[in-house]
């Protein structure tokens, strides 16, 4: 009976020690993640996604035969265009691909921590939620945001709640 008591006491001690160590490990992970998020520059991700949404709206929301869309029209004259805007002939937009590359470099820092990757995606959503116009644009932004890790060749978080303007959450 004494041996059984000692074994039970030892088992409880080991269980408590394991729980304490796990809690300490998770706390360190939270601090590490918070530090990574503070150092990360997620602005290129936000810019890439907003440009992508804008391009999609431009290509789906307008008449392709409209004179304002004609790359040969005077309004599209290269001498009159803003030199920093993407070329009308470049369907992807050079600025966006630069933003995507910089974004992927930043997201790569979170690849080994799926929870932290999710928090980075949540931060991007929160930063841009005020700029999104209407439910349709918000949903499109979320779709693009969910696909962002895969576009960068990274694993996407298995479960991640994305904050929505109404205060609820969308889970994917």
UniProtKB/Swiss-Prot annotation:
Residues 62-76 have a biased composition (Low complexity). Induction: Repressed by water stress. InterPro entries: Bifun_inhib/LTP/seed_sf, Bifunc_inhib/LTP/seed_store, Napin/2SS/CON. The keyword Hydrolase does not apply. Residues 77-98 have a biased composition (Basic and acidic residues). The modification 4-hydroxyproline is found at residues 67, 74, 86. Pfam families: Tryp_alpha_amyl. Keywords: Allergen, Disulfide bond, Hydroxylation, IgE-binding protein, Protease inhibitor, Seed storage protein, Serine protease inhibitor, Signal, Storage protein. GO terms for molecular function: IgE binding; nutrient reservoir activity; serine-type endopeptidase inhibitor activity. The keyword Iron does not apply. The hydroxyproline modifications determined by mass spectrometry are probably 4-hydroxyproline as determined for other extracellular plant proteins. Gene3D superfamilies: Plant lipid-transfer and hydrophobic proteins (1.10.110.10). Residues 1-21 form the signal peptide. Thermostable. Expressed in seeds, not expressed in leaves, roots and pegs. Disulfide bonds join 33-116, 45-103, 104-152, 118-160. Residues 54-98 are annotated as: Disordered. Belongs to the 2S seed storage albumins family. PANTHER family: 2S SEED STORAGE PROTEIN 1-RELATED. Resistant to proteolysis. Weak inhibitor of trypsin. This is Conglutin-7. The lineage of its organism: Eukaryota, Viridiplantae, Streptophyta, Embryophyta, Tracheophyta.
